[in-house]
Amino acid sequence: PDELMPLPEESELFLLPGRRAVGLNPETGETEVMEDWAVAAFAAPAHTLTAHPVYMTDEGAPMLPLFAYGAVGFANGRFYVCAKKVDEDVRQVFKGISRGKIDRSARKIIEDFPDNRLMQHIMQNCTLRYGCPAAKNLSLGRYEAPLPTSRTCNARCIGCISQQEEGSKICATPQCRLTFTPTPEEVVEIMRFHAGRETEKPVFSFGQGCEGEPLTEAPLLIESVRRYREAGGHGTINLNSNSSRPQAIAELAEAGLTSLRVSLNSARPEVYERYYRPHGYTFGDVRQSIIEARSRGVHVAVNL
């Protein structure tokens, strides 16, 4: 019981087709395979799952998409999940905000920015199609604005959520990758628009689930950040990245980057490379990027 918490609001429940639930019989203490399909929970943002659901997979069961599947149960009229709250930030909490309000705002922005391809992508694909929290925040003019920029990647992560290599056993990714490269003008226009609405603490984040590695478009990022800062643009400019290009990180820091979140599954090179399968960079480059960022006052965090 101490591993469970009430399922947080804005969480999601998944049915796991072709997989039969496994449970513990409280009378015998033995595990039993049920005839019903298994279920799982995706905990709301700011929560970390602590246990996976247990099930038996039937022959011919479909491949599950790359989501986070948490162990969930039901008792006393409500759902419980194995998870812990790890962040008090409310930027991805939409309690009390109707989906209709978000959609109306997104459609208005689509009308107002007909020539900005990146804005069209974020509103149509990310907000209206996927319900991305960062994209919804941009539509509402609060907190964080996502800035996807890259069609390509220099890693071949086993669990990539935007594009799997040909022949992969993972037949479907949760998101579709960006299909064009935006211009600095398109990026900066979104930054200025967001800063004009979220006037207190605007955040701009390169490196989203619907793109490749943003550092493969380093000149675009550097130019966009420089233009925004030189025009007096304020706020936090963040980069979610594999941090594979130390020189680009250094130039971004000089241009006005505020924070860097480094994707890292292990501090052991052999384990890192086994998952990320880097192309054209090494684990040593990642370490050097962190050094370059910290030496220039950039806040560095690790995305495990």
PLM features per residue range, with description:
Residues P1-E59:
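Short Lys/Arg-enriched alpha/beta "domain-start" segment
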Residues E144, P148, E165-I190, H194-E223, ...:
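Core AdoMet radical
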Residues P148-E166:
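Local cysteine-cluster metal-coordination motifs and their immediate loop/turn environment
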